A protein has these predicted regions:
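Short gly/ser/thr-rich secondary-structure transition/capping motifs
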Residues: 19-22, 124-129, 176-177
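General beta-strand structural signal in soluble alpha/beta enzymes
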Residues: 102-104, 145, 177
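ASCE RecA-like P-loop NTPase motor cores
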Residues: 12-13, 35, 164, 174-176
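Extreme N-terminal, non-catalytic leader segments
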Residues: 2-35
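Generic beta-sheet signal
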Residues: 35-39, 70, 141-145, 173-175
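Short secondary-structure boundary/capping segments
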Residues: 28-29, 90, 167
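Conserved P-loop
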Residues: 34-134
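Phosphate-binding/switch loop-helix module in NTP-utilizing enzymes
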Residues: 111-171
């Protein structure tokens, strides 16, 4: 029987670690911070999932005056190409410049392993150097490394270096790959 039909309210129901339902940030007594989110697979949705966390973090910074700041580092999404989410990100940056930074690296077109150039390697390294600095600085509460998995698949960065840096992130920092 669910809470409505049994006459008990959600507040009076015993809480368990398992089950079905939605616990909002307002309902949660403890926020789980410092997670490593990995979104992978074919098709759309990975970047949008990361942007949902970005939006939540910015909302916390606005509403609760928490010390939050987001780095949105977008590998393989150079300035030569427009993306659907660009206008929303730019609006957030204009409205709340103290809460979000964005860096785009790479060229604007798709390429395969056979088409990797020196520029691609330099841009991937430039982005990774920024990411490592952001992680080490502890300035950000959330660091999004959009398209990092394809960068690794293309062999543009050393996987072990990436893993080492992700493992050494400050306590409480969320990283989204």
């Amino acid at each position: 029987m669910d809470a409505v039909s049994s006459g008990t309210s959600q507040a009076n129901r015993p809480r368990s670690n398992r089950g079905v339902g939605i616990v909002t940030a307002a309902d949660s007594r403890e926020r789980s911070l410092g997670q490593l989110h990995v979104y992978d697979g074919d098709g759309k949705g990975k970047s949008q999932a990361a942007l949902g966390v970005v939006l939540r973090t910015i909302g916390l910074g606005i509403c609760e005056q928490r010390r939050t700041r987001v780095l949105l580092l977008r590998f393989l999404k150079g300035p030569g190409r427009a993306y659907d989410e660009d206008a929303a990100i730019e609006a957030l940056q204009q409205g709340f410049p103290h809460l979000i930074d964005q860096v785009r690296t790479g060229r604007g077109d798709y390429f395969s392993v056979d088409e990797v150039t020196r520029f691609d390697r330099q841009e991937a390294q430039r982005g990774w150097d920024i990411a490592k600095g952001a992680i080490a600085s502890a300035l950000y509460s959330v660091v999004v490394l959009d398209e990092l998995n394809p960068v690794l698949d293309l062999g543009l960065l050393e996987t072990e270096d990436v893993i080492r840096s992700l493992k050494s992130r400050p306590e409480g920092m969320e990283i989204i790959v």
